[in-house]
């Protein structure tokens, strides 16, 4: 599938999971409930605890979350194929456990990732097929206003600073 681009409708699937900010067990995140009513940023990463994601990509979003939200964004969605428990632990490790507007979402079967056209094959280094690195701005009508798709494992066009400049 071709990568998502500006002007495309953000896809939905019933096969993504999260642990609610108030805690509890993992459950499905019903994307269709907010895709047409909320403005949000999507950040897709290849894997929790991987050095580029942990040291370069996500820290900028955590540090700049108040600034991003001040631009009219309702929340930031972080997508990875890791399970919800791993993502909860990673969020805590990143110092963002209390950031309720930063929602870590598990896409275990890559259904959303495939609809975004953003898979990356890391089989050569033992990681299999993963979510590719990207960042999107989605408006309150569910339309992608900005799409930044990284080339391979780079961390450049999808950084928080680049997204803030587009908000």
From Swiss-Prot:
It is an enzyme of class 1 (oxidoreductase). Gene3D superfamilies: Glutaredoxin. It holds the Pfam family Redoxin. The keyword Hydrolase does not apply. Keywords: Allergen, Antioxidant, Membrane, Methanol utilization, Oxidoreductase, Peroxidase, Peroxisome, Redox-active center. It is a peripheral membrane protein. The keyword Membrane applies. Its EC number is 1.11.1.24. Residues 4-167 form the Thioredoxin domain. A motif (Microbody targeting signal) lies at residues 165-167. One of its GO terms (molecular function) is thioredoxin peroxidase activity. Induction: By methanol. Its main location: membrane. It is found in: Peroxisome membrane. GO terms for cellular component: mitochondrion; peroxisomal membrane. The active site is at 53 (cysteine sulfenic acid (-soh) intermediate). It catalyses: a hydroperoxide + [thioredoxin]-dithiol = an alcohol + [thioredoxin]-disulfide + H2O. GO terms for biological process: cell redox homeostasis; cellular response to oxidative stress; hydrogen peroxide catabolic process; methanol metabolic process. InterPro entries: PRX5-like, Redoxin, Thioredoxin-like_sf, Thioredoxin_domain. Thiol-specific peroxidase that catalyzes the reduction of hydrogen peroxide and organic hydroperoxides to water and alcohols, respectively. Plays a role in cell protection against oxidative stress by detoxifying peroxides and as sensor of hydrogen peroxide-mediated signaling events. The active site is a conserved redox-active cysteine residue, the peroxidatic cysteine (C(P)), which makes the nucleophilic attack on the peroxide substrate. The peroxide oxidizes the C(P)-SH to cysteine sulfenic acid (C(P)-SOH), which then reacts with another cysteine residue, the resolving cysteine (C(R)), to form a disulfide bridge. The disulfide is subsequently reduced by an appropriate electron donor to complete the catalytic cycle. In this 1-Cys peroxiredoxin, no C(R) is present and C(P) instead forms a disulfide with a cysteine from another protein or with a small thiol molecule. Belongs to the peroxiredoxin family. Prx5 subfamily. PANTHER family: PEROXIREDOXIN (PTHR10430), PEROXIREDOXIN-5, MITOCHONDRIAL (PTHR10430:SF16). This is Putative peroxiredoxin-A.
């Amino acid at each position: 599938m071709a990568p998502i681009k500006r002007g495309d409708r953000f896809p939905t699937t019933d096969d993504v999971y999260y642990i609610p900010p108030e805690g509890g067990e993992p459950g499905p995140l019903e994307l269709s409930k907010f895709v047409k009513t909320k403005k949000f940023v999507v950040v897709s990463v290849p894997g929790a605890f991987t050095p580029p994601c942990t040291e370069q990509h996500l820290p900028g979003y955590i540090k700049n979350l108040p600034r991003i939200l001040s631009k009219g964004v309702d929340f930031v969605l972080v997508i990875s194929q890791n399970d919800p428990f791993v993502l909860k632990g990673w969020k805590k490790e990143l110092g963002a456990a209390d950031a309720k507007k930063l929602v870590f979402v598990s896409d275990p079967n890559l259904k959303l990732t495939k609809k975004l056209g953003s898979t990356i094959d890391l089989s050569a280094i033992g990681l299999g097929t993963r979510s590719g690195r990207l960042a999107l701005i989605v408006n309150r009508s569910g339309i992608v206003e900005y799409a930044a798709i990284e080339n391979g494992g780079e961390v450049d066009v999808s950084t928080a600073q680049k997204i803030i400049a587009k908000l």
